[in-house]
Amino acid sequence: MPKTKKVDRETLPYRPCVGLMILNGEGLVWVGHRIAEPDSEFAGTTQLWQMPQGGIDKGEEPLQAAERELYEETGMRSVSLLAEAPDWINYDLPDHLVGIAFKGRYRGQMQKWFAFRFHGDGSEIQINPPPGGHTAEFDKWSWRPMQDLPDLIVPFKRKVYEEVVAAFSHLAR
């Protein structure tokens, strides 16, 4: 029987990441339906809708990372920056995923959020496959009202989405 090593979350760092709220001309927010991989933070949940997000590469500024991640995950380039959340927002993985998700290297994520306006049309959005040979993260997408977002995400990220909605709610009007 294989031995499992107990991981102490307090010894693990947060993964530095960016999150992106993309609003269309009607004030609706782009969300993608995640492809849930085994041993990911989405395994076993039905709440798989989320906004684009991703890691910050070494030497990369958060805004650069946001623009890169947006293109890698959605193909979108026709965007303009609207706002940056004032603070970094952290979340912790649930206990059963610590030591498993994120290859066991992180306790959760520390995210810097940006809001962008999308000026293109739906034909620009490419998720499966996304551009540049990247692995697909989403299998479908939708424009949703901002206030619905916290109910669409995995429960342990709900607080993050509540904070993001609070930071950017003025943009939906």
UniProtKB/Swiss-Prot annotation:
It is an enzyme of class 3 (hydrolase). It comes from Mesorhizobium japonicum (strain LMG 29417 / CECT 9101 / MAFF 303099) (Mesorhizobium loti (strain MAFF 303099)). This is RNA pyrophosphohydrolase. Its cofactor is a divalent metal cation. Residues 13-166 form the Nudix hydrolase domain. PANTHER family: NUDIX HYDROLASE 26, CHLOROPLASTIC, UDP/ADP-SUGAR PYROPHOSPHATASE. Keywords: Hydrolase. GO terms for biological process: nucleoside phosphate metabolic process; ribose phosphate metabolic process.
